[in-house]
Amino acid sequence: MSKKWLSVMVLAMFMLTLGLAGCGGDKQQGKKVLKIGTDPGFAPFEFQDEKSKEYVGFDIDLIKALGTKMGYEVQIQNMNFDGLIPALEAGNIDATVAGMTIKEERAKKVLFSKPYYQSGLIVAVKNDNNTIKSVKDLEGKRIAVQIGTTGADAAKKIPNAVVREFNNAPEAFMELKAGGADAVINDKPVTAYYLKQGGDKDAKMVGDVLQAEEYGIAMNKKSTELKTKMDKALDEMKASGEYDKLYEKWFGKKQ
C-alpha cells in the first residue's frame, strides 16, 4: 500500500471517529431536559444543603417528582428571585419553582400551574420587642424584606415605613438580628422554619397572617403544552398520596 493511500485511510478513520463522537453528543443533547430556575435562599422550599452542597427542599423534591412523571431530566439553576420572571420571558429557563405567589401582576407575564401550596405573610420581630404586636404597629418602622416578593409589596404599603430589600430571606433575618430593622415581613412557613432552626433565640412571630397566598410553578407565556403536562402531573401526585408524603417530610402532617 502506498504512503498516499495509507494517509487517506488514516484521515478517513479519523473523520469517522469524529462523526461517531458527534453522534454521541447529539444523543446526549437530545435528552428531554427541564431547566428550572430557583432562588435557594427560601428554606424549607429551596436551599443549599451545607454538607452536600446540593439544592434541597420541598419545591426541589416536588419539581423533580413532577419532572419524572413528565419524562424530563430536571436541571436546577440558581438565580435571584427578582430575575426569575425575566429569565422565563427570555427563554433562558423553562419554569421556576421558588415559592412564587400567584398574583395578577405576575400572571400578565407568565403562565402559572395550578396552586401547589397555600401560604401567607407574617411579621417577625426581635424577642425583646414588645411594642410591635401586629402589622398595624409598623407605621414609620424599618422593615426588612426579600426583593421582588409579596412581602416587599406589603411593606411598601405601610405609611412612612423604611423598607430595606435584600436578595434573600436569610439576609433579611440577619438585618433584624443585627438591629438594622425593626421587623421582617415574609412568608409564614419560611419564617416558621427559620425560627425552628434556631432563629427563635433572637426573633418571634407576631400578629395574624396578613394575607392568604397560593404558590404556583411559573412558565413562559407560550408554554401552554408544558403547563398542561405540569397540571396533570400535579393532579396525579395529589391523587396518589405522593404530594402528601413530600408535604409531611418538610412541614409535618397537615393541621
Show the residue positions of the predicted features.
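Periplasmic-binding protein-like
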Residues: 40, 118-125, 188, 192-234, ...
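Short loop->beta-strand "edge-of-pocket" segments that line small-molecule binding or catalytic clefts
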Residues: 34-38, 56, 135-148
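Acidic, polar ligand-binding/catalytic clefts
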Residues: 68, 73-137, 209
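A ligand-binding cleft/hinge motif common to bilobed small-molecule-binding domains
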Residues: 100-108, 154-156, 177, 182-212
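Short helix-initiation/N-cap motifs at beta->coil->alpha
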Residues: 60, 75-88, 130, 147-150, ...
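Extracytoplasmic small-molecule ligand-binding "clamshell" domains
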Residues: 30-99
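Extended ligand-binding regions for polar small-molecule ligands
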Residues: 60-69, 147-149, 216-254
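Sec-dependent N-terminal signal peptides of Gram-positive bacterial secreted proteins and lipoproteins
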Residues: 1-26
